[in-house]
């Protein structure tokens, strides 16, 4: 359950410019996700039932997006290490199943994340990103969601 060294390198190179401005990019991604998939906001206690305008104005937006991008950074940094990825994916899936979040919500993320990264002029790595999110989706399915 990991990426090849070449795939991990591609993901790392495309992620670097995104993570370099993680606060603004994290907020932008989360808002884009909620605009495209409004129901996903309901999986976050701070955003449940709120409009995009309310979420954008929320002081919690930065906290949530920062946690998400920090966690994603851990996956990126360990993407080629099968042992670490297996443990991280298992823990991640267990936590998210506990929140009621399943593979469908991460399929939504998977469907738009490569284009989001590309929109920031990051090097393309669509197939590698799809594989990384595929590992997350598979872990959630294995955990029952």
UniProtKB/Swiss-Prot annotation:
Q: Name one GO cellular component term.
A: extracellular region
Keyword terms: Acetylation, Heme, Iron, Metal-binding, Muscle protein, Oxygen transport, Transport
Q: Which InterPro entries does the record associate with it?
A: Erythrocruorin (IPR002336), Globin (IPR000971), Globin-like_sf (IPR009050), Globin/Proto (IPR012292), Globin_lamprey/hagfish (IPR013314), Mb-like_M (IPR044399)
Name the positions where heme b binds.
96
- Domain Globin: start-end pairs: 2-145
One example GO MF annotation: heme binding
Q: Which SUPFAM superfamilies match?
A: Globin-like
CDD domains per record: Mb-like
Does the keyword Acyltransferase feature in the UniProt annotation?
A: no
Give the N-acetylserine positions (modified residues): 2
Q: What is the annotated signal peptide range for this record?
A: none
Q: Self-association or partners: how does it assemble?
A: Monomer.
Entry's family note: Belongs to the globin family.
What more does the entry say? Answer: This molluscan globin lacks one of the heme-binding histidine residues found in most other globins.
Q: What is this protein called?
A: Globin
* Source species: Aplysia kurodai (Kuroda's sea hare)
């Amino acid at each position: 359950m990991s990426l090849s060294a070449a795939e991990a390198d591609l993901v790392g190179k495309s992620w670097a410019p995104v993570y370099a401005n993680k606060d603004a990019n994290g907020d932008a991604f989360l808002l884009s996700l909620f605009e495209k998939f409004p129901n996903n906001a309901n999986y976050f206690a701070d955003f449940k039932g709120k409009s995009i305008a309310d979420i954008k104005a929320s002081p919690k937006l930065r906290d949530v997006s920062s946690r998400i991008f920090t966690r994603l950074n851990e996956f990126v940094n360990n993407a080629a290490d099968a042992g670490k990825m297996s443990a991280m994916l298992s823990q991640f899936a267990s936590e998210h199943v506990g929140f009621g979040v399943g593979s469908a919500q991460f399929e939504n993320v998977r469907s738009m994340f490569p284009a989001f990264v590309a929109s920031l002029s990051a090097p393309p790595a669509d197939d590698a990103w799809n594989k990384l999110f595929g590992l997350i989706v598979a872990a959630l399915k294995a955990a029952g969601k």
